[in-house]
C-alpha cells in the first residue's frame, strides 16, 4: 500500500498525495471547487544549450535567468502544494538549490523538469537533490531512448519521461516499452520555434501524430503509467477510451481550474 506524503484541504475537497506521486481528491459535493492552485508550473530561466527545434520557450545558451529568491508569491505557498520547476536548463540557474531549500522549508513538493542529456550528465546531482528531499519527481524530456538511459530512469520511482505528440517516433515508443516506465505525453505547441518547425516538417509531424493517435492502446498496455497534458488530451482525443464515469474520475480539470503558470524571467503569470 502506498504511503501518504501529505494531505490538505482545498476549498470543498481534500487532496491526498502518496509517495509514488499518486494524487487523490475527495469531496462530498457535486464538483471540486478549489481555493488555490494545487500545481504551479514555474519557469526559472530561459537558458539552455540544447537548441531543440520545437522549443516553444525559444531558450538559448545566453537566455535570461529569473530572480527566483525574491518572488513574493513563494511566501503564500501552502504545505504540499506542488511546483514543477522548469524552463531551459534549470541546473544552470545559480540560485536553484537555495530556491529548493526555501520550498522544502515550506513543505512544498518540488519537481524538476529537464532535458534527457542534462539528466544523464548531472545524475549524481539529481540523486543528491532527491536524497536531500529537495525534489521529489523528475520530468525528463526524451531525446534518445538508449538502454543506458532506461536503466538510469528505472532507478527513480517518481521519474516520468516526457514526449511530445508529433516529435516522438514509433521507434522511441517501442524502445521504451515493457520497462515499467511512466510516460507523459505533451501536446504539440504551435508557437515560437514550434511554429517554424511545423512549417518545415508538417508531413513528418502529422504522420507521427497519426501513428500515436492510432496506437494509444499499445501504450496503455506497455507502460506502467501513461498521462497527458490537456493539449495532448485534445489532440489525441483521449476521451474516446473512457466511459463518462471513468472520465469524471480521472480527468484533473481544465487548465486554470487547479493549476497556475508563473514565468519568473518575464515576470508574468497565467492560469
Label every PLM stretch briefly.
Residues 71-76, 97-101:
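Ankyrin repeat (ANK) tandem alpha-helical domains that serve as protein-protein interaction scaffolds
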Residues 30-69:
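Canonical Radical SAM [4Fe-4S] cluster-binding loop centered on the CxxxCxxC motif
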Residues 57-68, 79-93, 103-122, 127-148, ...:
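Core AdoMet radical
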Residues 51, 87, 265-266:
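Residue-level recognition of short loop/turn positions
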Residues 133-270:
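Radical SAM enzyme [4Fe-4S]-AdoMet core and its adjacent flexible, acidic
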Residues 12, 22, 53, 267-268:
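Residue-level signal for well-ordered, solvent-exposed loop/turn and beta-edge residues enriched
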Residues 1-42, 246-247, 257:
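N-terminal [4Fe-4S]-dependent radical SAM core
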Residues 25, 270-271:
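A sequence-level detector of short linear motifs
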Amino acid at each position: 500500500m502506498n504511503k501518504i506524503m501529505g494531505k490538505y484541504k482545498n476549498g470543498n475537497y481534500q487532496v491526498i498525495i502518496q509517495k509514488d506521486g499518486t494524487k487523490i481528491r475527495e469531496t462530498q459535493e457535486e464538483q471540486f471547487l478549489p481555493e488555490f492552485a494545487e500545481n504551479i508550473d514555474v519557469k526559472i530561466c530561459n537558458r539552455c544549450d540544447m537548441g531543440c527545434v520545437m522549443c516553444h520557450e525559444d531558450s538559448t545558451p545566453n537566455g535570461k535567468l529569473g530572480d527566483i529568491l525574491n518572488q513574493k508569491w513563494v511566501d503564500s505557498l501552502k504545505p504540499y502544494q506542488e511546483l514543477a520547476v522548469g524552463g531551459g536548463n534549470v541546473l544552470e540557474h545559480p540560485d536553484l538549490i537555495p530556491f529548493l531549500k526555501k520550498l522544502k522549508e515550506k513543505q512544498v513538493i518540488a519537481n524538476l523538469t529537464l532535458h534527457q542529456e542534462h539528466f544523464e550528465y548531472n545524475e549524481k546531482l539529481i540523486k543528491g537533490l532527491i536524497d536531500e528531499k529537495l525534489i521529489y519527481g523528475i520530468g525528463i524530456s526524451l531525446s534518445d531512448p538508449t538502454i543506458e538511459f532506461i536503466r538510469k530512469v528505472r532507478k527513480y520511482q517518481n521519474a516520468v519521461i516526457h514526449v511530445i505528440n508529433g516529435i516522438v517516433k514509433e521507434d522511441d515508443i517501442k524502445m521504451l516499452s515493457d520497462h515499467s516506465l511512466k510516460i507523459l505525453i505533451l501536446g504539440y505547441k504551435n508557437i515560437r520555434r514550434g511554429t517554424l518547425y511545423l512549417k518545415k516538417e508538417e508531413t513528418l509531424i502529422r504522420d507521427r501524430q497519426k501513428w500515436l493517435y492510432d496506437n494509444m492502446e499499445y501504450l496503455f498496455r506497455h507502460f506502467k503509467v501513461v498521462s497527458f497534458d490537456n493539449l495532448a488530451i485534445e489532440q489525441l482525443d483521449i476521451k474516446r477510451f473512457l466511459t463518462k464515469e471513468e472520465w469524471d474520475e480521472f480527468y484533473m480539470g481544465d487548465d486554470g481550474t487547479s493549476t497556475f503558470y508563473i514565468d519568473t524571467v518575464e515576470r508574468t503569470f497565467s492560469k
